Design a protein with these regions (language model features):
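N-terminal cofactor/phosphate-binding cores enriched in small/glycine residues
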Residues: 2
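Non-catalytic terminal extensions of PLP-dependent enzymes
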Residues: 5-157
Length: 157
């Protein structure tokens, strides 16, 4: 529906803006997050966790994980990006800003990810216990896998 609404004549412009947005975000965060692939990206790019100086050393068992970064983004009102995919890297975090995001929104996203990197270095417990501000906090992923329920059953009081 979105492509149809843009019309054939605007689709090439939307694609160019999407590529521009991805490269803008990538270049503004490269000093904070590990960038395993250099060069100009298309509409998306992948970080391999945080740079070591912000607590992202994969060889350290206490490193800040991509999951913790993604959970902390929720506290700032951003949807968590795709994480641990593609499987090419240990701490993959795929960033895919769309063509419809304003520069103001991109700048806010960049500022938040920079702030999260600084939090990881100075107050890592904020990331380890994130999200703090969502109605549901950390889910028990192991329990969810072992006790999978695929239908909703209302609780009876």
């Amino acid at each position: 529906p979105c492509i149809l609404a843009m019309g054939r004549e605007n689709l090439p412009l939307a694609a160019k803006i999407s590529v521009l947005n991805a490269n803008y975000v990538k270049e503004n965060l490269r000093d904070y997050y590990a960038l395993p692939i250099e060069g100009i990206c298309k509409h998306e790019f992948v970080f391999d966790g945080m740079r070591a100086e912000y607590g992202g050393s994969h060889s350290d068992a206490s490193h800040i994980t991509t999951l913790e970064v993604a959970k902390r983004l929720l506290d700032y009102g951003f949807h968590a990006p795709t994480i641990y995919f593609p499987l090419l890297f240990h701490e993959s975090m795929m960033i895919e800003p769309t063509e419809s995001e304003s520069k103001e929104t991109l700048d806010k996203f960049i500022d938040v990810l920079k702030k999260i990197a600084l939090e990881a270095r100075e107050t890592p417990h904020l990331l380890r216990t994130a999200p703090q501000s969502t109605p549901v906090r950390r889910l028990d992923d192991v329990k969810a896998v072992k006790d999978a329920r695929f239908t909703y059953t209302p609780e009876v009081n």
